[in-house]
Amino acid sequence: MSPLDSMFLLGESREHPMHVGGVQIFQPPEGADARDVRALLDTALTNDDRGVAPTLGKRARRSWTSLGQWGWDVDSRLDLGHHVRHDALPEPGGEAQLWALCARLHGTLLDRSRPLWETHLIEGLRDGRYAMYTKMHHAVADGVSAMSMLRRTLSDDPDERGMRAPWQPPHPRPPATATDTVSAAGVSDLPRAAVRAAHSAVGELTGLVPALAATLGRAARDQGGPLSLTAPRTMFNEPISGARQFAARSWPLERLRLVAKAADATINDVVLAMSAGALRAYLHWNGALPAQPLIAMVPVSLRDEQQGSHGGNGVGVLMCNLGTHLPDPAARLDTVRTCMHEGKQALAAMSTAQILAMSALGASPAGASMLFGHHPKLRPPFNLIISNVPGPRRPLYWNGARLDAVYPLSIPVDGQGLNITCTSNDDIISFGITGCRRTVPHLHTLTSHLGRELDALEHAVGL
């Protein structure tokens, strides 16, 4: 297990569950309903001769053979009845009830004695659809790899039937063996592994000094990059509890695409500008809008498509000035666009190792808060995380049920009580807002502010 993945286990507590989640909403095929889906899943549970995907069959453990480091061990007695569960919404079965259930599920810890995931089939939606809520520990997968695993369980063909359950491998695989993957060759290979790692690091070390100097210089000039020194204190940057709130909403992706084209920006710039306007309105409504602009940490994926299907974490970060001190939506979008362009130019001049090192520099204060607790007198390194996880770009189905939407749930941490994550699916983009129930009151109002900000951006660019 990598040091980054281990950190997600070390930093976990009752107040800080460290799993990512997602809600997938499906429209059953004509003549079917959620009961038919439940029957399919029950059959897969009782006649499970296909096993589980390798990522879902491993559990975290430490032992003397790994010198106390976290590693992975295959669970040879995996109990699917524990991991796959059924839930039903109370009346009237609307989005408010669905988000409330997902928030409660997202606030509970995963059992570390088992593989670190759960899937919940949720029935009772009043429009006849059904939902699947899945949570997976961040040590197992980040948002990109989790989305890749979701895509592999679905089909382009609405008429395909007999598809495997979401937890099953897409193709037959040889049985796994119980080995600790901290060091495949065991403790005896650790000295040689250390020598190899040191040798490969020598070339990178010489490049870290100028990369560090450039990163510090950009931060001092308040330019985009992996580090910021100007994030203000806000109501989001307080100690958190373990209870969660969640809200979500979708918009046609074409609306964001047209705004981006008119403003010579990217869709992700528009996502950030929508978030900036919504945060400004929310903070102003709460009498808590700071004079300085909020800073968002924006994850940047460093993995390729093949890596994405094997779990794990591979991300760098950029710090983005959201321009929340500016009343004009067009000015906020221009601020975001400029800052992200500067940041991407900075990353383009670095190697992958340098990007990871500078990203660690920018994010390390938040990691320290996660491990040791939030210090209220320290300025936050950033105010919240806003991420955009690419999803499937075409209609996808599971045994004829169409995937209508994917809503991500992420991880608030101590000192960072709010997270905004969005993902695209076919022709829509969905925002998932996860927050500490105590730190972020009335979180659901942010979705209304997002909608109004998109309207304002369209007006600002002449649409």
Residue ranges and their predicted role:
Residues M1-L4, V23-R35, A39-Q416, I420-G451, ...:
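Soluble acyl-CoA-dependent acyltransferase catalytic core bearing the H(X)4D motif
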Residues R14-V20, Q24:
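TRNA-binding/sensing appendages of the translation machinery
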